[in-house]
A protein has these predicted regions:
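Charge-rich interaction surfaces and accessory domains that mediate macromolecular binding and assembly
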Residues: 157, 299-318
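C-terminal effector modules of nucleic-acid-centric enzymes and ribosome-associated factors
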Residues: 221, 240, 245-253
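Mixed-charge, low-complexity segments
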Residues: 226-228, 252-257
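Second RecA-like catalytic domain
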Residues: 1-208, 230, 238, 242-245, ...
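Extended, non-catalytic structural segments that build the interaction scaffolds
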Residues: 220-233
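Catalytic machinery of carbohydrate-active enzymes
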Residues: 96, 249, 311
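Short, glycine/acidic-rich hinge or "gate" loops at secondary-structure transitions
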Residues: 257-265
Length: 318
């Protein structure tokens, strides 16, 4: 998370959030004053991210701190149902994280308040916290686990399709806390070492002169890319070669002309014409024969139009 934040240029923002996640929630919600506490905390809510709530509380504390005595600051915190003691713990963890960064010669920089960069950084450290909205606004998380959004979340009325959360809570139901709206496109680049891929429907693509297939990408059992077209050459080269010969060469489904295809077509046409005239079936050139002809003569690495063109060019030069 911290290394990702450094790469994204939002280390100053993420250090505050990371420190908060390592300490108890500074928000107080006493049983006898829940409504008052909820009303006081309303000023910090964010409809896209509970993590940004932490930054708002942090900023609130530092704004109130200016010009106030310790006792006055404690009173302001109490009036807003914020724990002064836990705030000091948060500050201490932040100081420790900041010191570790400085020891590693990592420049912290200034706050940027960039939503995408901040949440991509958080996602890098909380990949197992991703979830997708299912039926009846119940979210599906890693490993098939299901849960609801925490009622106090700023997103509880929004129910975004994809979220990131940092904490699961078990009460009468299972809830996820500290959640934020995320883009599914962020997940694969950050979790590329953990994703699983499956492929279906390999087919010859005339325009690109190669075999394409459809790829599905999943992380922790959640489908993050349902279906996208990908080149198949590095996945199953043997299948590519078979389809290349069958459809690209035998059926001549190529996007550019190749002289040898025209010549071979003429030879086959002449043989078929002669077979018709003489009624000699042994002169009919069968598809399997043509396949073997190409398979025997083309090097193994020739599996699409690009590799064929390159091999022909090198053969002519040599």
């Amino acid at each position: 998370m911290i290394l990702a934040a450094n790469d994204e240029g939002v280390l100053a923002d993420v250090l505050i959030i990371a420190a908060a996640l390592e300490t108890q929630d500074v928000r107080d919600r006493p049983a006898e004053k829940q409504k008052q506490a909820d009303a006081a905390h309303e000023q910090f809510k964010d409809s896209d991210s509970d993590f940004l709530v932490l930054l708002k509380i942090w900023d609130f504390f530092h704004q109130q701190k200016k010009g106030l005595s310790n006792n006055q600051l404690k009173k302001v915190m109490q009036q807003n149902f914020l724990s002064f003691t836990r705030m000091r713990e948060w500050l201490e963890v932040f100081r420790q994280l900041r010191e570790l960064c400085l020891q590693q010669k990592i420049k912290i920089g200034s706050r940027r308040n960039d939503y995408d960069r901040i949440h991509r950084s958080l996602l890098a450290g909380l990949l197992s916290g991703i979830a997708i909205r299912g039926e009846k606004h119940i979210y599906q998380g890693a490993g098939g686990m299901s849960f609801n959004l925490w009622p106090g979340s700023g997103l509880s009325d929004q129910n975004p399709k994809w979220i990131l959360g940092s904490e699961l809570v078990e009460t009468s139901k299972r809830f996820i806390r500290n959640v934020a709206r995320i883009q599914p496109a962020w997940i694969e680049p950050l979790g590329k070492h953990l994703v699983t891929r499956s492929h279906s429907d390999p087919h010859w693509h005339v325009k690109s002169e190669q075999v394409m297939a459809f790829e599905k990408v999943s992380l922790f059992g959640l489908v993050i890319v349902p279906r996208r077209a990908v080149a198949f050459r590095n996945i199953e080269p043997h299948t590519c070669r078979t389809l290349f010969i069958e459809e690209g060469l035998i059926l001549e489904q190529m996007n550019r002309p190749f002289v040898f295809l025209e010549n071979n077509r003429e030879v086959i046409s002449q043989a078929e014409s002669l077979a018709t005239k003489t009624r000699r079936r042994d002169l009919i050139v069968e598809t399997a024969t043509i396949f073997r002809f190409y398979d025997d003569r083309l090097p193994d690495h020739v599996i699409d139009g690009a590799s064929l063109f390159k091999w022909l060019k090198e053969s002519r030069e040599n």
